Swiss-Prot record:
<keyword id="KW-0007">Acetylation</keyword>
<feature type="modified residue" description="N2-acetylarginine">
    <location>
        <position position="38"/>
    </location>
</feature>
<keyword id="KW-0148">Chlorophyll</keyword>
<feature type="binding site">
    <location>
        <position position="136"/>
    </location>
    <ligand>
        <name>chlorophyll a 3</name>
    </ligand>
</feature>
<feature type="binding site">
    <location>
        <position position="79"/>
    </location>
    <ligand>
        <name>chlorophyll a 1</name>
    </ligand>
</feature>
<feature type="binding site" description="axial binding residue">
    <location>
        <position position="245"/>
    </location>
    <ligand>
        <name>chlorophyll a 6</name>
    </ligand>
</feature>
<keyword id="KW-0157">Chromophore</keyword>
<dbReference type="GO" id="GO:0009768">
    <property type="term" value="P:photosynthesis, light harvesting in photosystem I"/>
</dbReference>
<feature type="binding site">
    <location>
        <position position="254"/>
    </location>
    <ligand>
        <name>chlorophyll a 6</name>
    </ligand>
</feature>
<feature type="binding site" description="axial binding residue">
    <location>
        <position position="216"/>
    </location>
    <ligand>
        <name>chlorophyll a 4</name>
    </ligand>
</feature>
<comment type="subunit">
    <text>The LHC complex consists of chlorophyll a-b binding proteins.</text>
</comment>
<dbReference type="GO" id="GO:0009416">
    <property type="term" value="P:response to light stimulus"/>
</dbReference>
<keyword id="KW-0479">Metal-binding</keyword>
<feature type="binding site" description="axial binding residue">
    <location>
        <position position="172"/>
    </location>
    <ligand>
        <name>chlorophyll b 3</name>
    </ligand>
</feature>
<keyword id="KW-0793">Thylakoid</keyword>
<dbReference type="GO" id="GO:0016168">
    <property type="term" value="F:chlorophyll binding"/>
</dbReference>
<feature type="binding site">
    <location>
        <position position="261"/>
    </location>
    <ligand>
        <name>chlorophyll b 5</name>
    </ligand>
</feature>
Length: 265
């Protein structure tokens, strides 16, 4: 009797496993006759930056967080006073836009400070101050990218503007509309060929990197805003402003410039 029970149990297990495999096979081949199965079950990251016990925007003094901010996504500190994330579709779109703007801001901030740093260390490649570099196109000799006439030599602002509109329009159109290059990949974190260093191979490390990216990206967006204000108020680049402040903190600070700033001068 015991042997019979064991055999029946084994047969039932094999039958269930066969049925499960058959279901997976059918689902996998449903998409246009192609086996395109994807893993949809995700384990929650064990990082302190996720979940209900994650750090909040005011620490222990934070108010009750909205029910739709569960700590599932990176950079969620439970703060949404305006209710911008209440609608799931709007929330998903805003998350994508924020990550994209974060990446552009980090590249832009680096592009604002790096030429000045090189210039301070004796490397000459044209105008180093970021908001003055583009104005060289109006000079008689035009604008040489990286100060090298053998690279891109621009003399028409309209041609540069049109080229950027076309190139960025094509890229953004492809990103929004989709195409074979990114088919089946996550729109924000595609991985694969877009992760040649394999930084996303470890799920827990990848979850931490997402948080670091969004935090540094938000800081970069604020930095870019500060660079814009500095350019208007002081007429200098961020590195030169930093050197001036270190040399004389009393005379060169935000309060001193704000109280003495006269628009148009």
């Amino acid at each position: 009797m015991a042997t019979s029970a064991i055999e029946q149990s084994a047969f039932a297990g094999q039958t269930a496993l066969k049925s499960q495999n058959e279901l997976v096979r059918k689902i996998g081949s449903f998409n246009g006759g192609r086996a395109t199965m994807r893993r949809t079950v995700k384990s929650a990251p064990q990082s302190i930056w996720y979940g209900e016990d994650r750090p909040k925007y005011l620490g222990p003094f934070s108010e009750q967080t909205p029910s739709y901010l569960t700590g599932e996504f990176p950079g969620d500190y439970g703060w949404d006073t305006a209710g911008l994330s209440a609608d799931p579709e709007t929330f998903a779109r805003n998350r994508e836009l924020e990550v994209i703007h974060c990446r552009w801001a980090m590249l832009g901030a680096l592009g604002c400070v790096f030429p000045e740093i090189l210039s301070k260390n004796g490397v000459k490649f044209g105008e180093a101050v970021w908001f003055k570099a583009g104005s060289q196109i109006f000079s008689e000799g035009g604008l040489d990218y990286l100060g090298n006439p053998n690279l891109i030599h621009a003399q028409s602002i309209l041609a540069v503007w049109a080229s950027q509109v076309v190139l960025m329009g094509l890229i953004e159109g492809y990103r929004v509309g989709g195409g074979p290059l990114g088919e089946g990949l996550d729109k924000i974190y595609p991985g694969g060929a877009f992760d040649p260093l394999g930084l996303a191979d470890d799920p827990e490390a990848f979850a931490e990197l997402k948080v670091k990216e969004i935090k540094n990206g938000r800081l970069a967006m604020f930095s870019m805003f500060g660079f814009f204000v500095q350019a208007i108020v002081t007429g200098k680049g961020p590195i030169e402003n930093l050197f001036d402040h270190v040399a004389d903190p009393v005379a060169n600070n935000a309060w001193a410039y704000a109280t003495n700033f006269v628009p148009g001068k």
